[in-house]
Amino acid sequence: MVYREFQELKLSGLGLGMMRLPVLDGDDGRVDEAAAAEMIDYAYHNGINYFDTAWGYHDGNSELVAGKYLSRYPRDSYYLASKFPGYDLSNMDKVEEIFERQLEKCRTPYFDFYLFHNVYEGNIDAYLDPQYGILEYLLKQKENGRIRHLGFSAHGSVEVIQRFLDAYGKHMEFCQLQLNYMDWHFQNAQEKVALMNKAGIPVWVMEPLRGGKLAQASGELAAFMQSARPEETVPGWAFRFLQSVPGVTMVLSGMSNMEQLKANIATYETDEPLVGDEFEGLVERMDEETRKAGLPCTACHYCTSHCPKGLPIPELISLYNEHKATGGGFIAPMAVGSMPEEKRPANCIGCRGCEQVCPQQIKISEMMADFTSMIGM
């Protein structure tokens, strides 16, 4: 395992993200605990010492699973991260209540790393509003040893992140960004990394494989990979890209099965950043594919808890993208037709509640209307 220095610590270069644990019957809220425990144990015994969870992951069950299975190991033998769920504005006045409950769920007296979760356009004003006292409370917990390192994650624009840094930057020790070779330009990740480098803030990476989208390659992108590094796996290219980005300390991957976990750990046995024209060649070919592709959903499921109709939004977006990419066909209409009528895109009421929490800023209501018109249901 490659290790990175962070202050006085040595962190595994790869961390286990606990947002996409194995689940039962496709239900995101029902974690397959036996499979998850096996993954946690394998990660722990094969060099991973950083585990990342959050209040809302797996409908609130990720922290419970983290606590149940990590607590079997000495507390000083691993690093645990969680986050304050400010992506939901109704939580802003509940920081103490939520923090105390998180400690209970995770069966720990402290968090090694704690984050303001998802700083973006929809919550920046609330995060910075002194009436909630969020920063003051978290700094007090740090003073009391219940938070060892304080940081933030962000899906917002460069301008929003700069506002956050202007207000709280001197207290931030790390920043978690959506970073991969697809988003280097598409989501302005390059500019965000430069902002962190300038501020001297280490970068934590989320979505290194873009929700699994970068685990496969085709066309010119695949040909380029095969020509440049024929021995490297497609997911390996995503991690080698990140090993090339200045300021990256931690790469978090939300792995869903043992096969993914073992493969990624194997990749992180070595540090092999891209060289020569590999970096730009990879990005250029991905940019071209992105221009041809559909909506950039990562299936994070933030949207589903904010849909009053209970629509399976990530699944519908995936089918929409498939329908667009193939220029029609029968697969999407067949799949949607097999769904209960109340789960189809035509049932979207256009409230845009989902759009308020979408990290990718997808215009979901417009997609639903477009999809409905295309397939007639």
How does the language model describe each region?
Residues 104-126:
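Active-site groove signature of glycoside hydrolases
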Residues 20-34, 83-93, 122-127, 221-232:
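Active-site mouth loops of central-metabolism enzymes
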